[in-house]
Amino acid sequence: AACEELDYPLFVKPARAGSSLGITKVERREDLPAAVEAARAVDPKVLVETGITGREVEVAVLGGHGDDAPRVAEPGEIVMDASHGAGEFYDYQTKYLAHDAVQMVCPARLTAAERELVMSTAAEAFLAIGGEGLTRVDFFVTDDGRAVVNEVNTMPGFTPFSMYPYMW
């Protein structure tokens, strides 16, 4: 019954995984069970989220010592090019195998208000989870300037294709 009320597309993903492993974009209700099983193959706990249309922006946060405020880097933006092999979303294939399909733009092309919003929200998210050390907060920035937190990643990638190191 709950599936009848969902707005598609949906994204089904493991609750505790990285690198976009096990994530499926679901366009039709009948594809939902297979997507849930794909996510469960990675983690028994599964999230189902409504798809959000927006630019993908990431913000690196580094925890301070004691009462020091966390440091927040300039936001970076993931820009994908389907003509060079990017998938429908920033999936494992696009992140690690379709290098020509992704451009990491840092600093992100944001308005001053959008920049302030994602940076302050990233710091708030870091503090809300009791963050320590490094974290990356991923957003969707919508056409009307809203910033929607996609996830808080407490183990951001450090590969040659990862955004976190570029943001500092």
Spans of model-derived segments:
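ATP-grasp fold ATP-binding core
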Residues: 3-23, 44-54
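Phosphate-binding site of ATP-dependent enzymes
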Residues: 27-120, 141-148
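Short small-residue beta-strand/loop micro-motif enriched in glycine and branched aliphatics
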Residues: 19-20, 101-104, 159-164
